[in-house]
Curated annotation (Swiss-Prot):
Species of the source: Kluyveromyces lactis (strain ATCC 8585 / CBS 2359 / DSM 70799 / NBRC 1267 / NRRL Y-1140 / WM37) (Yeast)
GO cellular component: myosin II complex
Entries under SMART domains matching the protein: EFh
Protein name: Calmodulin
Keyword Transferase: no
Keyword presence, Repeat: yes
PANTHER family on file: CALMODULIN LIKE 3, MYOSIN LIGHT CHAIN 1, 3
Amino acid sequence: MSQNLTEEQIAEFKEAFALFDKDNSGSISASELATVMRSLGLSPSEAEVADLMNEIDVDGNHAIEFSEFLALMSRQLKCNDSEQELLEAFKVFDKNGDGLISAAELKHVLTSIGEKLTDAEVDEMLREVSDGSGEINIKQFAALLSK
């Protein structure tokens, strides 16, 4: 559950959780979840909070215990790390910082470094995510890497 969290993170989460656990019951209401997450620097949408509640409130009591909250925060931080890594990888290719990378440059990298792909494989991948402009934005890049 919280094996990938540091003691410092757990303490920070416990402090934030306790601020909203007004009656010291060891749980917070579903409506307070988004506020707690925002106080910790995350920015979940209402839909994301609803999805998270469906996943972690398995007993349907509309309350989140600290252990459930830790598991949730651990997962959220992992997702944020992945998003940050993706953004950093994109920036490597986005030389001029305009939010776009050339499909030709990306093709060169994918066919020459790491697990080398063939021209045909790269062309197929680019065809699936590209809008035909010859450039790839961050969303298309994410879609490409998830293939």
